Amino acid sequence: MELGKGKLLRSGINALYQAIHPVHGLAWTDGRQVVLTALHLNNEEPKFGNSIVIGQFEHVHGLYWGPFLANDTPALLAVQHKKHVTVWQLCYSPSDKNKLVVSQTCEIGDPFPVLPQGCTWHPSKDILVVLTKRDVSVLYAVRYENSSLKADIKSSGLIHCACWTKDGSRLVVAIGSALHSYIWDSKQKTLNACAFCPVFDIGGYICAIESTVDSQVAVSTELPLDRICALNAGIAFTMPASSEITISNQPGLLLMEEEFSMDGVQKSADSGSLTTDSLATSPATLDLTHIVNHSKADLNSLLNLKKKDYLTGSGQDSSHLILVSFEKKVTTTRRVSIPGILVPDILAFDPTAHIVAVASNTCSAVLVYSLTSSSVPNIQQIQLEKNERPKGLCFLTDKMLLVLVGRQKTSDPAFLPSSSSDKYLIRLMVKEVMFDEDSSASSGGNTSVQASNDSCMSIQDKKKMVESLYKESPSTHRELLLPSGTAPPTYLRKKKLIEEIRSYDGDQSPTSSANEFDEKRNRLRMESFDTEPKNCSVTLSLDMDKKPISGSTSPKSECQNSSPPNFIQPSDVSPQQEILSISRNVERLCCNFAHLQQHLSELTDITRNGKRPLSASYLPCRQAPYVTVVCQDAYHPEGPAMKRSILLCENKLRLGTVQELFGLSLIEMQLGPSLWIILTGDSEGFIPLTFLANQEITIRDARIAAMHPPLRMDRNNSMQPSSSVT
């Protein structure tokens, strides 16, 4: 359903959060108008009806329906503006059932702007929470007055988002990387900090929060920029598609899910090794992409090279979806990585199917996860168009996901946006959440059995369970195990956190593969190029030296030797050749950056002048505009001078050319019989003057002239040095 043009916030919003009312339908805004669209479900199929405009303001950033109490109770709608929030009451007229009566009940303002997702209603009471970056205000009598109270924030950090738990007993506020928990006292009308868990740090900057079931919330954390730079994603490797990894030759596995408790002890298995006993913590979905086992020698190497992770880019870290349960005396969490989305600031949860949708206002992908008892496997990925962004998510049923899509205009990525909002073409899209019953039953069934019988499982049973997980889907051994038994889409497998810089001719360089085996025998080798790549990108690979014959071998090495290798055998290359190959590729990389700098300079000219200088605008050779530069000897001004003719560039002369031509670092130019000025350069290196064609100018060394200025005779017959102006 097309909604037309609208101006929405760029990031941090879920425009469909608390946006659907059972009676009045969908509330949405184009940035100025408040619009209600009828929405009905016929046999679980959504049907959109007529739309009416009930208000128009200068700025509307969000709309939130209050809890549905009864059919005869007027509905409450919170309208979020820039620095204030108004609450409106809607009901149909008793005399005319088709006439909608709208009246304002209360309003709250703040010196600070309201956060993008700045309002959240209590699930069962007329209590509204308004958020700014510094304050949490609770309006507990929205139908009658503007009475409110502010939470006692024990932190100097910035507030980002908040939500009520599903049971309504707790308000969870996200401040930085910590969750601040508050208990609402309905009798005293107070908000008190939780006694057993007032603050719970989850170790990542929180983007969004959503209540799930009972006292549990789902939290998404972003991948910070400093972590992206620390991942060395630019020198990670890409495994060939034919290199299938089996369980028999893996030195270690990393559990996808991590569990934490209030004591701060990490319960999940370490990435360095995995014993069968550690499966009791999380016997469910395994992340088979983090299989590299580094030794201490690898950590001390000059280049710490890693295998490319098809899901997160480098195999080290990613944004995360975290489940936090606030129980009576303990707080526990479980987490799963979110591939391909750096800032997941949109969350939506369906309580019937126990599934959560994750998206970002800056990414065109939507991921759907299933909240099972012991794991959070990725079950579906929805891919939008390249210039489309999800601006809101909401589950209509357990199988229908409503997506508010904003289509952006093509913008110049070289410049950061100056405004917090942008114009979009808005439309509503309904996507069906697909379930593969056979694979879901097998995967989900195994998960439930593992969760319930985990304490009584033997070591042998755990081994069989892990082997069965690998055998179910051979094509996903190096990727995330999906309940449907299929590999993640190509978008997720090849998504990179840091895109490689390509030259403008569009050619692609050949790529090589990385295979990591025994950590003590890995060595770095630079593959030589068969052809010269135009973009001068570097291709790296790891190869294994030939192992010496020994009397005894470990079971791990026997498994590795028994399996046929799926990689290119290294050739005998001397260390000198390797060093030469490395130096050549470094030179190619520097060449690539030089070309990039040249293109950036051209882009700067285009943005400043509004057009690209075309060769068609050049003058013929016979009409070449040039100036004759006469370099005068500072010691002997009347002596012979050096002359050079220099071509003008749009009547401009480049200072560096003159300096290099005459070997002068500081130059003076003669403007009159006794006036000399020292030349400087602008941001582009040109002398900030225009010259005429066939003009002759006189210059000299300014340093020598300053030490030995030529003398002249004034009116009083006294000797005075000639003037010099800078």
UniProtKB/Swiss-Prot annotation:
Record region (Disordered): 502-574
Q: Where is the composition biased (Polar residues)?
A: 506-515, 550-574
Basic and acidic residues bias: start-end ranges: 517-533
Q: Which SUPFAM superfamilies match?
A: Tricorn protease domain 2 (SSF69322)
Q: Spell out the coiled coil positions from the record.
A: 581-609
UniProt xrefs under InterPro entries: WDCP (IPR028041)
UniProt keyword annotations, A-Z: Coiled coil, Repeat, WD repeat
Q: Which GO terms describe its molecular function?
A: kinase binding
Could you tell me which residues the WD repeats occupy? 55-98, 154-194
What name is this protein filed under? WD repeat and coiled-coil-containing protein
Gene name on record? wdcp
